[in-house]
C-alpha cells in the first residue's frame, strides 16, 4: 500500500531516507476511502484490529469488517442529520467501536474530536461551546454519562447524545451492537453518495483540545492529509510491516492514539492490538503482550518507568522486535535498564499535537539513550537561537521552516484563534516552544519547554538534565524539576520527587534529601543540583500523562 503514497518506498540508510523521501498525495485524499476501503477490496480477510479487555473478551476484525461496520455507522449518523463539517466529540476509552466510528465520520466529512474519559462536566462545557459541538458519542460508563448530562444544559449546540452502551440514559440515543454489525450500510444510498462525493484533501478532518502544560486547552485542527503524514510514524519509526501486530498504549482521547493505533499502522497494513483495560497494571500489559505475541510496542516514558521495575524475564516476549517512546523525554537510565533486561533499544521520537513525528530514531539509526533522534525529512527542522542556527551542543528552539512549503502533517491553525496561531507561526517558521541541543552526529536531545528553563545565578539550567541525574538513584520513581524564587540567585532549582516502592519511608528522613542532592552533584555540574527537594505521593499531570510543571510552579507563587 505505501508504494501508492511515496515516490520511493524503500530506503537503504538514513542518508537515503533524508535525500529521497517524498510523498505522493492523491487529490482529495481521504484515509477512509483511499486506505481502508482499498484494503477491504484488495485483502478483505487481512486482520486489521485485535481487541481484548480485562474480562478476557476478544474480537478480531478484518479490513472488510471495518468497512462494513463503518458503512453501517455512516447510515446511522446520516439518518440523524450529521453532515460535513459537523463537530462530533467521541469519548470512547479503548472500546472497539472507536475504530469503525472514526472511519465513518471521515466518510461523512464531519470533524472528529477525540476526547478523554477523564473530562469533568466543566471540561465538556468548555469544549462544546468553544467548538460548537453538535454530537457527543460516548461509551456507556456511568461516570462519563453523568458528566455529560451535567454539562448538557450549558451546551446549546449539542443536538445528539449517543451511547454505545451498556448504559443508555433517558434522553440519549443508543448505537447498539446490531447497528454497528448489521445496519443498513450495504443498501443505504447515502453511503454510496458520500463515496461519490469523496470529501478529503484540505477539508477539516480531526481536532484536538491540547491537554497543555499551561493555560486553557487550544483547539488544534488538521485536514485529511494529516492521516497520510503518519505513514512515516509507522513505517520508519515504529518499524511496522504488513505482518506486524502493533500495540501503542493510549486512550483514544489522546493524540497518541492516532499516532500508534490507527492511521500509519493501517496504511502499512499492520494489525492494531488494543488492550481495553480499566486500571493500568504493568503485569497485565506484559501478560497480554506475551499471550498475543505483540511484535512492536510504543508507550509513553511513564509506562517504561513502571515496566523496568517488574521482573520482565518472567514473560516470554520473544515476539517483540521493536520498541519506541514519545510524549516526553525518556531518562537514559530507564532506557539502559530496559536494554540490559530485554536486549532491545527504545527508539525515541518527538512530535506534538500540532504535528506528526517530527524527530525520531528511525529504523536505520543507532539509538542513543536520551536522544530523540534526527529530523523526519518530511519536515524542514531547524534549531534556532536568537534568529540564527544553533551550533552543536548549543541549546535552541525546535522550529519548522514553512516559507517554501507547508509540510504534510503540520496543523492548519488553532481553530478560531488567529492571534494564538500567529504567535507560534510567523516569519516563515512554526515555533514548537520546545528546546533541544544537537550533537556533532546530528542527534537531538530534549532540554525542556521554553518556559521551563531555570535561570539561576547567571546559569541556564534545563530541568530534564537534573531529572535525568535524579532518576539514576534507585529510590526515585518520578520527579519534576522547577524554579522557585530566590533573592540571591534570582531562581533556585527545586525537585519534586515521587519515591519508588519500598523507599517511601525515606521521605521522613531529613538526611535523605541531602543524599539526593549529593547524588545529583556526582552525576552533573554541582550548580545544577536542587537546593530544595519535596517528596510527594504523585506528580500533577495532564490528561495525556505529561508532567504539569506549571502547576508545581503556581503552588510556589
Please annotate each region the language model reported.
Residues 267, 294-298, 308-368, 380, ...:
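Gly/Ser/Thr-rich phosphate-binding loop
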Residues 119, 125-126, 136-141, 297, ...:
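AMP-binding/adenylate-forming catalytic core of the ANL superfamily
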Residues 103, 107-178, 501:
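Structural core segment of the AMP-binding/adenylate-forming
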Residues 228-248, 252-295, 310:
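Conserved AMP-binding/adenylation subdomain of ANL enzymes
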Residues 45, 49-103, 120-125, 176, ...:
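Conserved AMP-binding/adenylate-forming core of the ANL superfamily
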Residues 44-47, 163, 168-169, 183-209, ...:
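Conserved pre-ATP/AMP-binding loop-to-beta segment of ANL
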